[in-house]
Amino acid sequence: MELRDLIGALEAPMLMGADNVDITNIQSDSRRVTKGSLFVAVRGTAVDGHAYMDSAIEKGAVAIVCEETPSYLEGRCSFIVVKDSAEALGLLVSRWYGDPSRKLMLVGVTGTNGKTTIATLLYEMFRKMGHKVGLLSTVCNYIDGEAVPTDHTTPDPLTLHSLMARMVEAGCEYAFMEVSSHSIDQRRISGLSFDGGIFTNLTRDHLDYHKTVENYLKAKKKFFDDLPAGTFALTNADDKSGLVMLQNTKAKKLTYSLRTLADFKGKILESHFEGTDLIINGREVMVHFVGRFNAYNLLAVYGAAVSLGKDPEEVLIVLSTLRSVSGRFETIQSPLGYTAIVDYAHTPDALTNVLNGIHEVLDGKGRIITVVGAGGNRDKGKRPLMAKEAVKLSDQVILTSDNPRFEEPDDIINDMVAGLTKMDMERTLCITDRTQAIKTATMLAKKGDVILVAGKGHEDYQEIKGVKQHFDDREKLREIFSTQQS
């Protein structure tokens, strides 16, 4: 593709040099540049691509997109100067792949909790309705039925548009994706054409990156601000930030709620470990999900499907057949008559939601034993809050290690303990080894009790000193249960 055809996707680019050069590929990592590359110099959180423009030229880049050009490089290749090279990258890659997101009905899901569940259930629902569908999520990306492993909630623009192009090639009509606050702030979703957006909730998370809750909220809100007319913006009316998301959007404004009047109104009739009886917009449905937080997720799924033109009755029928997402309130039964639940809850609010969901079902008839940790090199402020919520809503808590990364696990546990009183500590054990922590919980549990193993969910690794070592909470529990005699 010629450079002039590519830069037509950009707003007011300043070209220095020839525009008729042939581009063989687009790169934002100078190490991947080859002969004929267009190199986009992006200012990242840790690395500034502008420092590698010289290296990119030496490796064969014939054009560079940047925010400023050093005079000593002028004349060595074509330069395109833009206001925001991160924004430009997405637009260029989209053009390179033929703007694939415009050929799909693309819906983004953002918020602190619930993104994976909502995006995955929409993917499964639309497949059950006979459509070819794509999914971009924390757990895995899917092109119709083909799994494509993932490392981030939202991939980089090169991967993202490449996946979208593969979805179009595979005949997909719809795509559902998680949209993280990082990806919005870093313009990783630049160049994508969304047909709708869903907001779940907003609680403390990622403050190691955003610094304040206000910045975190602004990042989420920008996604809705950028939705054009003719799309839909569906928000949780019961979350204090829900209506804020709709303030400046041009999209059709829609709400879902369990507490107030809304376009999609739900009510919980009864909860049990097999599922929940719900009323949605006056129609009763039995679903295979537990807890109030999941009722919100299902309302969002219902609302999005109806907003995409699906028949409400058909949506309810399919909703009743859907099952829980991997590592989200995933139940494993012990032969000794107690239940283990593995959940990804890794924020204070998510932990509260899951524990409240367990209480709704137990109704005071069994004890709750919670195994929980906090990730290393992430928001330290949430550590004492996690411990506090766990103790408040559990009968016994075991604090343990959870992806310590480059921190010492005991230091993280000490940060968690800082949120507890002497009385709280009477119901709290600190066991650094996660395997031992899970084993201890199973030794303490009796018939009718529930063990919650929180924080990792679908993850099958522990990240220690930069190395991901295999570790799966579900595997550990099944190994223990396989040795138990009823």
UniProtKB/Swiss-Prot annotation:
Residues with the modification N6-carboxylysine, per the entry, are: 220
Q: Which residues bind UDP-N-acetyl-alpha-D-muramoyl-L-alanyl-D-glutamate?
A: 30, 153-154, 180, 186, 188
Briefly state the modifications made to the protein after translation.
Carboxylation is probably crucial for Mg(2+) binding and, consequently, for the gamma-phosphate positioning of ATP.
User: EC number(s) for this protein?
Assistant: 6.3.2.13
Q: Which GO terms describe its molecular function?
A: ATP binding; magnesium ion binding; UDP-N-acetylmuramoylalanyl-D-glutamate-2,6-diaminopimelate ligase activity
The Gene Ontology biological process terms listed for this entry are: cell division; cell wall organization; peptidoglycan biosynthetic process; regulation of cell shape
In its UniProt entry, what is this protein called?
UDP-N-acetylmuramoyl-L-alanyl-D-glutamate--2,6-diaminopimelate ligase
Q: Which family does it belong to?
A: Belongs to the MurCDEF family. MurE subfamily.
- Give residue numbers for sequence motif Meso-diaminopimelate recognition motif: 402-405
What does the UniProt function comment say about this protein? Catalyzes the addition of meso-diaminopimelic acid to the nucleotide precursor UDP-N-acetylmuramoyl-L-alanyl-D-glutamate (UMAG) in the biosynthesis of bacterial cell-wall peptidoglycan.
The record's section on PANTHER family has:
MUR LIGASE FAMILY MEMBER, UDP-N-ACETYLMURAMOYL-L-ALANYL-D-GLUTAMATE--2,6-DIAMINOPIMELATE LIGASE MURE HOMOLOG, CHLOROPLASTIC
Is the keyword Ion transport assigned to this protein? Answer: no
Q: Which reaction does it catalyse?
A: UDP-N-acetyl-alpha-D-muramoyl-L-alanyl-D-glutamate + meso-2,6-diaminopimelate + ATP = UDP-N-acetyl-alpha-D-muramoyl-L-alanyl-gamma-D-glutamyl-meso-2,6-diaminopimelate + ADP + phosphate + H(+)
Q: Which SUPFAM superfamilies match?
A: MurD-like peptide ligases, catalytic domain, MurD-like peptide ligases, peptide-binding domain, MurE/MurF N-terminal domain
Q: Which domain of life is it from?
A: Bacteria
Keyword entries, A-Z:
ATP-binding, Cell cycle, Cell division, Cell shape, Cell wall biogenesis/degradation, Cytoplasm, Ligase, Magnesium, Nucleotide-binding, Peptidoglycan synthesis
Location (main, coarse): cytoplasm
Principal EC category: ligase
- Pathway of action: Cell wall biogenesis; peptidoglycan biosynthesis
Pfam families with a match to the protein in the record: Mur_ligase, Mur_ligase_C, Mur_ligase_M
Recorded hits in Gene3D superfamilies, A to Z, give:
Mur ligase, C-terminal domain (3.90.190.20), Mur-like, catalytic domain (3.40.1190.10), MurE/MurF, N-terminal domain (3.40.1390.10)
**Where is the protein situated, by its record's location annotation?**
Cytoplasm
* Amino-acid positions noted as binding meso-2,6-diaminopimelate in the UniProt annotation, renumbered to this chain: 378, 402-405, 455, 459
Q: Where does ATP bind?
A: 111-117
